[in-house]
């Protein structure tokens, strides 16, 4: 396994994105024959391109977590046409990451219908241009990118662990993260009362910052889930595809979408290039456990992941996440403890 890229903590910049666009990751060649791969948000962009690669590399079963079954069917048909994989390979399961009930239903289906899951790629994410609450009462990016992603990860851990034990080699749980987590100012997340509450407040919402904030919080979640899992059974990591020409800004107004699209056109990777990182992240060894996978390397995360203050805030936030999820499901902490 490669060592860290640099001792400099992760941070985004135009020059870094330019470099990344000129140095795309290697295209994975690992065979996924005999493997069952789960991916959320595979309808478009990075998720679609990653799913396409998994199919082309011979995955025996692909589980698609999709909000829209109609769009899921379109993606399935497209991938089958391009890879000639059998219709029995791709399975569509409905998943609305804004709904706890939908997440629970999805996890139950996965656990009951599939004997094994060798890798789960938690790719679904949003970048809302305006403040909006989820049905569960949280700001939408906070809900989907952080709270719901944490919940789904915890619900999938037992299946991943059982698969790893039976196979005699670790499975993979991948959080799709972002180098933007390194740009977050500590003042935006520091709150003695509640970090969740602070990030959830409409008065604190700035669409230009919220996505990066949620990606920092997701990094914290990833590290704590990794701490709860044995790397010999489940390798948990975060993967950053860098700035990509993807559908992430699809909800932006035309005034916002135009400059966003222009920047991505000039210094962004293609969705196909970015998806290579999502695929290679589930081929990493135990040294990548709890790590930040970027540019085909284990990179150094941002300061608020590695510093003493960041770790202290991370502990506070993790307790808040567990408190929130335990209200929905009293078995959350038990599921984590059984994986450690």
Swiss-Prot record:
Binding site for NADP(+): 46, 71, 96, 123, 211, 215
InterPro entries per the UniProt record, alphabetical: NAD(P)-bd_dom_sf, SDR_fam
GO MF annotations, alphabetized: oxidoreductase activity
List of catalytic residues: 211 (proton acceptor), 215 (lowers pka of active site tyr)
E.C. code: 1.1.1.-
UniProt keyword list: NADP, Oxidoreductase
Pathway: Mycotoxin biosynthesis
Function, in words: Short-chain dehydrogenase/reductase; part of the gene cluster that mediates the biosynthesis of the cytotoxic leucine-containing cytochalasans, including aspochalasin C, aspochalasin E, TMC-169, flavichalasine F, aspergillin PZ, aspochalasin M and flavichalasine G. The first step in the pathway is catalyzed by the hybrid PKS-NRPS ffsA that utilizes 8 units of malonyl-CoA to iteratively assemble the octaketide chain before addition of L-leucine by the C-terminal NRPS modules. Because ffsA lacks a designated enoylreductase (ER) domain, the required activity is provided the enoyl reductase fssC.
Similarity-based family: Belongs to the short-chain dehydrogenases/reductases (SDR) family.
Protein name in the entry: Short-chain dehydrogenase/reductase ffsI
Source organism (scientific name): Aspergillus flavipes
Gene: ffsI
């Amino acid at each position: 396994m490669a060592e860290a890229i640099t001792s400099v903590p992760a941070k985004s910049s135009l020059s870094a994105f330019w470099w990344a666009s000129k140095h795309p990751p290697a295209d994975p060649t690992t065979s996924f024959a005999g493997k069952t791969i789960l991916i959320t948000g595979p309808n478009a962009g990075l998720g679609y391109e990653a799913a396409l690669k998994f199919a082309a590399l011979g995955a025996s079963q692909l589980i698609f977590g999709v909000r829209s079954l109609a769009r899921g069917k379109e993606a399935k048909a497209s991938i089958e046409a391009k890879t000639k994989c059998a219709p029995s390979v791709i399975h569509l399961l409905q998943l609305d990451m804004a709904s706890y009930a939908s997440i629970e239903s999805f996890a139950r289906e996965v656990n009951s219908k599939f004997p094994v899951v060798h890798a789960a790629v938690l790719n679904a994410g949003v970048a809302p241009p305006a403040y909006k609450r989820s049905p569960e009462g949280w700001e939408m990016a906070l809900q989907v990118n952080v709270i719901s992603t944490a919940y789904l990860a915890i619900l999938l851990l037992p299946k991943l662990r059982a698969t790893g034990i039976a196979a005699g080699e670790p499975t993979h749980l991948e959080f799709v993260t972002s180098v933007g987590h390194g740009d977050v100012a500590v003042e935006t997340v520091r709150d003695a009362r509640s970090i969740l509450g602070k990030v959830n407040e409409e008065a604190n919402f700035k669409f230009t910052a919220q996505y990066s904030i949620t990606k920092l919080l997701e990094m914290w979640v990833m590290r704590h889930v990794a701490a709860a899992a044995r790397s010999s059974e489940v390798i948990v990591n975060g993967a950053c595809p860098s700035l990509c020409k993807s559908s992430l800004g699809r909800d932006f107004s035309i005034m916002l979408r135009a400059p966003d699209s222009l920047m991505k056109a000039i210094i962004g990777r293609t969705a196909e290039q970015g998806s290579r990182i999502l695929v290679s992240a589930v081929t990493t060894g135990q040294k990548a456990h709890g790590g930040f996978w970027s540019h085909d390397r284990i990179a150094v995360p941002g300061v608020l992941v590695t510093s003493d203050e960041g770790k202290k805030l991370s502990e506070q936030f993790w307790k808040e996440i567990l408190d929130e999820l335990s209200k929905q499901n009293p078995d959350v902490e038990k599921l984590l403890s059984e994986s450690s």
